[in-house]
Amino acid sequence: MTSARSHLTDLTRFAPLLPGYQPREPQLEMADAVETAIRSGGTLMVEAETGTGKTLAYLVPALLSEGPTLVSTGTKSLQDQLFFKDLPLVRKALGLPRKVALLKGRANYLCPYRLELHQEEARFLTRETVEQMQIVAHWAGRTRTGDIAELQQLPEDAPIWPWVTSTADNCLGTDCPSYQECPLMNARKEAQEADLVVVNHHLFFADAALRGSGAGMELLPSANTVIFDEAHQLPEIAAAFFGDTLSTRQVQELGRDSLSEAGQTTADLATLNQLIASVEKGCLDFRLSLGEMERRAPWSEVCDNEAVMRAGEDLLEALRQLDVFLGPLGKASRGMEACSRRASEHVDCLAAYLQGDQPNRVYWFETFKRTVVLHSTPLSVSAQLRAQRERNPCSWVLTSATLSVGGRFEHIQKRLGLDSADTLRLESPFDFKKQAVFYAPEGLPQPSDPAYTRELTEQMVPVIEAAGGRTFFLFTSHRALREAAEILRTRITYPLLVQGESGRRELLDSFRDKGNAVLLGTSSFWEGIDVRGDALSCVIIDKLPFGSPGDPVAAARIEHINRNGGNAFRDYQLPQAVLALRQGAGRLIRDPQDTGLLVVADPRLLTKSYGKLFVNSLPNMTKTRKLDVVQRFFAYLARQLHGEKPTEKEGQA
């Protein structure tokens, strides 16, 4: 095959499609490495920092190669960007008739069967839901793909979606009467026929878990090459899919679906209603037994509580009775057969959870206002991923802007079971020394001090003023975010956007539109967000992002590492925090023309021995501890923006 390098350096291909396009050496180096991995069937990890052009560096060799390729992303937004923007451009530049397809998880597609099943039911409790059903029904008649992302007038969390999309629990598969017009099945068929399929990590690991279960099922086509973008997310996503989850919402949906399906059979509806009522009561009592507060906690914290265990056993017994009732009805219809299967699976899952004795797993739960979610999560996924890799003798390419810690890949290699992977680290071509200033403020108390957030927020007011708003203020806890929000409401005049008061997409759209806003966010705003230009000129990080000691999975991993002779702080907590800080800091400079200020306020950065690892992991920006330097820097940028000559003092900022 013709080399990717020769195509990327051919200006007649890309320059007409990308104004100002010039091949970059880091991009070419990555393309060479990806091409070698594809040819050899090897495993390659590439850390490609912002600005290296990694998307073209893997898409070009992937499209030039023979055989099908899967490209997996961490987020649906990147998935859509690759399919609708990047791939059409690369295909046009290469002039290759490659077939490409987009495949998402089943919850992203309309289910015609469930739409018809629920459309005429009078169990929609609110006017909002009725109106949403009408919108969906109208759209269903004209959509080609059935991808619910098309219907932008409904939010992602609209209450109608569970009624008109399927889950692995309730999908009837080939037995569904709507199988021929099923958008999900049509998307899978297109994927089977494509040369390159864009998926996401959740779908990839759902498929891997199915294949590993020995069930003889698969969601994705086989591939010669798998490319993971945003690969730093793989360990946590893999852990979720190689574990087990059961929620009271799933159990309640089983009851509702059983009742809907039973209307088309000769089932004893009175008895079924009684059994479903018992299950509903069991779900409610189980939720109440865990206390009013919403929380995440290890099961070991409550498994000796008699009331909790009794409520769990009562729910299990109610589920067993429903399972026994549904068993004979499975022959009545495909829908009832699916409900019967789900009931048996829920019984097995809840029984195993209440037993809670599987080794190398952490059993934990989450409580929400009306729901309990039970989780059984593996402490490590390295063995499963190693087995997955060995079962599939194809090329694996893993890339992200943040894979290494201190320039070394051992941490991510060990977590993924890919110790022998080849590695390549490519630094950003941006001139951070000229584009950005790093500010570590003086005089703050230790982060454990109750006054820390208040004093930090007060110190950041003049920084925000100097930046003219245009700030991401990133927090490691919701409590600190709420405290800072209350202070800033009375201290700044810029638009204040606070996570939790609107959806993530709405907040980001508003931030871009206003041009001088201050956005306060926690973990979901630390990565996967790309705000270029003048709307974002300052990123403030309140603390070094060590994982919460109250997180049950992290706590169990820490205990496991220490119990087996390791050093959990050095081997797990510190590397994870470094990678998280690099992600947060990466929100600032997204473009060669971007400029701005990065604030890492945590005094441990300079007072603790491990602080150097954090500092050295960040881009080499101009560093200061003085507020007046920060103010001169922003004054300098403002004059530049208006075409004025900066003062001598500002030029020295």
Give the location of each predicted region.
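A substrate-engagement module of RecA-like helicase motors
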Residues: 2-17, 67-197, 202-205, 256, ...
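Walker A/P-loop NTP-binding motif
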Residues: 35-36, 55-68, 85-89
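Conserved helicase motor "Helicase C" RecA-like lobe of SF1/SF2 P-loop NTPases
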Residues: 476-500
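Walker A/P-loop
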Residues: 40-58
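A contiguous, basic/glycine-rich beta-loop/short-helix subdomain that forms a polymer-engagement track
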Residues: 162-197, 208-217, 321-444, 451-458, ...
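Conserved pre-motif I regulatory segment
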Residues: 2-46
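Signature of the SF2 helicase/ATPase Hel1-core->accessory helical subdomain module
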Residues: 64, 80, 85-88, 168-169, ...
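Conserved RecA-like P-loop NTPase helicase motor core
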Residues: 441-451, 501-606
